[in-house]
Amino acid sequence: MPSADNDTDEKPSWADLVDEAGETGLTGQIPPSSEVREGENKIVTEYKRDDEGKLQKIITTYRVETRRVAKEIAKRKLWKKFGDSKNDKPGPNKTTTNVCDDVFLILTSNKENPDATEEDPLKKLSGQKIVQCRICKGDHWTTKCPYKDQLEVIHQQLKEDDGSGQPGTPPSEPANPAAASTSGKYVAPGLRDGANRRGETMPSRSQRDETATIRVTNLSEETRESDLQELFRPLGPISRIFLAKDKFTNQSKGFAFINFVHREDAARAIEVLSGFGYDHLILNVEWAKPSTQQ
């Protein structure tokens, strides 16, 4: 008769021993893993022992998807494995390969704080006009002005009109005193070029032809008298330019008066520049109303 001490010893369950003996074949070894395909599913059965020495059966089901890849990628998958992985099955081995999402590397020039905005001297000058066009007052060179072609056509038409004998040719400019002496020596005013010429009398208000006055509207606030002089001078000689300015800001009020010497030049200025795009605005050029003389 067995003693009572033997009855108190822990023994494995009879059902566990039967299952383990059926799976291991009474050899005590772990059976190899198996793989079964059922349509689009792949069932992988694996065996392992836990910390207590019990045999565990792990069944993993995978869904097989067929994807079209590039030819180079398909060739790489057919490469033979080498080293410790030469006996592995096709595909990644979870013991040596970790499949995860793609990680995109973003390089930054400033490692400490990439979002910090440092004081860049070029950014400080971005709000200032370093380059200013002489035609449209934009932030670009005069040679790259979008209105350059339109002004060239106007200058070409004026040259053709001047060559045909029409009035309005500008008078010859006086000689430059600095060009009279190239040696750099002092020349007395009486000995300079043009000293013996007789001065011309200035025309009085009654002699001024106010019928050759035009009114220009829709000007920008940055417009100056020199800009109007450069724009209207090719059309004929100008006797006076009046640009209306604000007495506090000294900026243009948007209109000006141009007095031409000849009425034909004023009419041609209205025909050529009325509707012309200047400084992102469309100019309106018309005849000015005559002033009332007392």
UniProtKB/Swiss-Prot annotation:
Any single Gene Ontology cellular-component annotation: eukaryotic 48S preinitiation complex
Annotated compartments: Cytoplasm
The entry's keywords: Cytoplasm, Initiation factor, Protein biosynthesis, RNA-binding
Annotated ranges, domain RRM: 212-290
Gene3D superfamilies: 3.30.70.330
Matches recorded under InterPro entries: eIF3_g (IPR017334), eIF3g_N (IPR024675), eIF3G_RRM (IPR034240), Nucleotide-bd_a/b_plait_sf (IPR012677), RBD_domain_sf (IPR035979), RRM_dom (IPR000504)
Pfam families with a match to the protein in the record: eIF3g, RRM_1
PROSITE patterns: RRM
Main location, first listed in the record: cytoplasm
Biased segments, Basic and acidic residues type: 194-211
Biological processes, Gene Ontology terms: formation of cytoplasmic translation initiation complex
Annotated region (Disordered), positions in chain: 1-43, 160-211
Domain of life: Eukaryota
GO MF term (any one): RNA binding
Keyword DNA damage: no
Similarity annotation: Belongs to the eIF-3 subunit G family.
Oligomer and partners: Component of the eukaryotic translation initiation factor 3 (eIF-3) complex.
Record function comment: RNA-binding component of the eukaryotic translation initiation factor 3 (eIF-3) complex, which is involved in protein synthesis of a specialized repertoire of mRNAs and, together with other initiation factors, stimulates binding of mRNA and methionyl-tRNAi to the 40S ribosome. The eIF-3 complex specifically targets and initiates translation of a subset of mRNAs involved in cell proliferation. This subunit can bind 18S rRNA.
Protein name: Eukaryotic translation initiation factor 3 subunit G
Species of the source: Nematostella vectensis (Starlet sea anemone)
